[in-house]
């Protein structure tokens, strides 16, 4: 089989390749708010800004009108940076302790990765997780057989994380990619798709395996068509804001999209 005009596919982690439904970070955000301040947030509120670095994520949750109102009522003042620091301090050990429990690959992701590699395409990756958490997740995912060629954590770069392009571009540099147009960014969350656009890459959003659908693997596997379509539409309404080039259900559907991108590249198109 001929080598591909695509040089690299850069995957997000939770909700994209591992952790169907992206439950590791969301459930722990709820727990960290509870542990840090005895303050309740819902899973839906925890999911809202998913894809950002985790400190920025806590800050964004605090700015949600529903959360800000309850915080003001409970504490008599708005959330401030020292509060975010305290919640983040509670978040980190919880996440480090539990992230390995959510390292199982999303169905068909390993086969898709191997299929992509067989075409001579590099496998990059980046995450909203900080390095301390990623080191645990990388090892756990490797035990399942997932070993990307490069990994960038959200706090690796002084310039910052998503939605800026820096983590994606760090993959470009380290993987020796010669043209960002030959890269595809795959993500289940809005900031990750925006990151791909900002890096000049093709972007693919995932509707059913990630944060926006919020389905467990079991719910997904046993859902009827109506339930799946409702989840699909819910995720699409959010992800479409970033105007991804493609929207698919899960990484299992990625090979067909990559074939289309290859044809577009060969025809001289750019993202």
UniProtKB/Swiss-Prot annotation:
Which residues are responsible for catalysis?
A: 12 (nucleophile), 54 (schiff-base intermediate with substrate)
**Cofactor binding note from Swiss-Prot or TrEMBL:** Binds 1 Mg(2+) ion per subunit.
GO annotation, biological process: DNA repair; organic phosphonate catabolic process
Quickly give the catalysed reaction. phosphonoacetaldehyde + H2O = acetaldehyde + phosphate + H(+)
User: Does the entry feature the keyword DNA damage, yes or no?
Assistant: no
A Gene Ontology molecular-function term?
Answer: phosphonoacetaldehyde hydrolase activity
- Protein residues bound to Mg(2+): 12, 14, 188
Q: Where does it sit, as one GO cellular component term? A: cytosol
| The entry's keywords | Hydrolase, Magnesium, Metal-binding, Schiff base
The EC number on file is 3.11.1.1
InterPro entries named in the record: HAD-like_hydrolase_sf (IPR050155), HAD-like_sf (IPR036412), HAD-SF_hydro_IA (IPR006439), HAD_sf (IPR023214), PGP-like_dom2 (IPR023198), Phosphonoacetald_hydro (IPR006323)
Phosphoprotein listed as a keyword: no
Top-level taxon of origin: Bacteria
One Pfam family here: Hydrolase
What this protein needs as a cofactor is: Mg(2+)
HAMAP family (UniProt xref) = PhnX
Subunit comment for this entry?
A: Homodimer.
Q: What does this protein do?
A: Involved in phosphonate degradation.
NCBIfam families registered for this protein in UniProt: HAD-SF-IA-v3, phosphonatase
Family, per the entry? Belongs to the HAD-like hydrolase superfamily. PhnX family.
Name assigned to this protein: Phosphonoacetaldehyde hydrolase
Native species: Vibrio cholerae serotype O1 (strain ATCC 39315 / El Tor Inaba N16961)
Gene expressing this chain? phnX
């Amino acid at each position: 089989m001929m080598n591909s005009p695509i040089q690299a596919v850069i995957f997000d982690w939770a909700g994209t390749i591992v952790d169907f439904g992206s439950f590791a970070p969301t459930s722990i955000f709820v727990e960290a708010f509870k542990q840090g301040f005895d303050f309740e947030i819902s899973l839906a509120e925890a999911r809202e800004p998913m894809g950002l670095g985790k400190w920025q994520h806590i800050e964004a949750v605090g700015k949600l009108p529903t959360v800000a109102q309850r915080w003001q009522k409970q504490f008599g003042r708005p959330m401030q940076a020292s509060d975010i620091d305290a919640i983040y301090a509670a978040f980190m050990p919880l996440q480090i302790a539990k992230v390995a429990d959510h390292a199982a690959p999303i169905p068909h992701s390993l086969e898709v990765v191997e299929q992509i590699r067989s075409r001579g395409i590099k496998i990059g990756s980046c995450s909203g997780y900080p390095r301390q958490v990623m080191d645990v997740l990388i090892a756990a995912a490797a035990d399942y057989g997932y070993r990307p060629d490069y990994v960038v954590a959200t706090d690796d770069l002084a310039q910052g994380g998503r939605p800026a392009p820096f983590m994606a571009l760090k993959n470009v540099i380290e993987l020796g990619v010669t043209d960002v147009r030959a890269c595809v960014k795959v993500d289940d969350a809005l900031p990750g798709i925006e990151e791909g656009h900002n890096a000049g890459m093709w972007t693919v959003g995932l509707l059913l395996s990630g944060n926006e659908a919020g389905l467990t693997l079991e719910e997904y596997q046993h859902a009827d068509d109506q339930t799946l379509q409702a989840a699909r539409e819910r995720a699409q309404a959010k992800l479409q804001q970033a105007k991804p080039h493609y929207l698919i259900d899960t990484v299992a559907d990625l090979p067909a999209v990559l074939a289309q991108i290859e044809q577009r590249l060969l025809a001289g198109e750019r993202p």
